[in-house]
Amino acid sequence: MSIKLLSLFHAFGESDSKILGSVEIINSQLIGTGACLPDFVLTNEMLEHMVDTNDEWIVQRTGVRERRIAKNMHTWELALGAAQDALADAKIDASELDLILVSTCTPDTNTPNTAAILQDKLGAGAIGAFDINNACTGFVSATDIADCYIKSGKAKTVLVVSAETLSRIVDYTDRGTCILFGDGAAAAVYRATEDESLGIQSTFVAADGSGAEYLRMEALPVEDPFAEDRTVDPKARFLKMQGAAVVRFTARAVPQAIDTALQRAGITADDIDWVVPHQANLRILDVIARRYHLPKEKVYVNMDRFGNTSSASVPICLNEMRRNGLLREGQTIVCTGFGGGLTYGAFVLKL
């Protein structure tokens, strides 16, 4: 078996040392993070004047107190700000990148993709740049792809950006959704390392399309292309969510994702220093802490200040933790995402 083929086995999750033999193992080390958050803050008190709700009701059910809204800002602008911040933190120039990945379910345009816009704005040169749309699991999925590129030798340095302007697709007359979501972007830079003790130790991503209707946002109307009246209902683009069904899915999917990632990394819950989950609902985050017998303070939470920012939530957390000195050398971090699709996943990161 060729060395190239062996590398591909490892890139796609094969961990059997008998198969890998003496092949050099390359890991994906996190070398920088960044974020870009809109200035405008939408508080629960402000929502009381827009929809039938109040601060106490929102906090008790979700944990959200305020969220950021991108007024007169494009998704690509948030993405660019986060990317520039991450590159500065990593102390590298965009010319050193081999690949740009953007996860978003709220792009400004279906084409061109947001990553291509970033490639130009950053001055990154002739490199690969593409978007993925995997809803709230987007950052975890993009990290998995970045790790595959690095492990296979196709890339040395990869920029992953998650950017969302969910306020565009939220119905502010629907108190079941408008209380949850916010806008924002964050980014991570991964670089190849030969140190097996650093970087991404394992990844896991999966989907359960049987729950597709639980979280849904129409892209293009299904209609007769030759119909005389092609008027589209303005509310057709709004996000629709069956909250109770999503919570039931999460209770099953998140432990499966984390357990699988831990198993693939060859570690147990006792080795975890931090869990960095998608910021969906405070009750869900409490369930994660209980499931893995972790103190609540070891499950990072910032959704009280930013709400649910879909794919951007995990990297926003990572950036905030890194800037506040909470991420330290030798720690083991588990990041997990879950949401529309339905999709779910996790990865283990060693610092």
Give the positions of each predicted feature.
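Acidic-glycine-rich active-site phosphate/pyrophosphate-binding loop
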Residues: 51-58, 109-123, 160-166, 222, ...
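Short beta-strand segments
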Residues: 31-34, 103, 133, 158-164, ...
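Condensing-enzyme catalytic core mediating Claisen C-C bond formation in acyl metabolism
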Residues: 2-72, 174-248, 252, 256, ...
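Flexible, glycine-rich active-site loops centered on histidine and acidic residues
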Residues: 151-185
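Short acidic, glycine/serine/threonine-rich loops at helix termini
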Residues: 41-42, 111-113, 169-174, 344-348
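Claisen-condensing/thiolase-fold acyl-transfer catalytic domains that form or cleave C-C bonds
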Residues: 76, 80-83, 87, 106-107, ...
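Anion-binding (especially nucleotide phosphate/pyrophosphate-binding) glycine-rich loop
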Residues: 89, 93-125
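Short glycine-rich phosphate-binding loop at a beta-alpha junction
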Residues: 96-103, 270-278
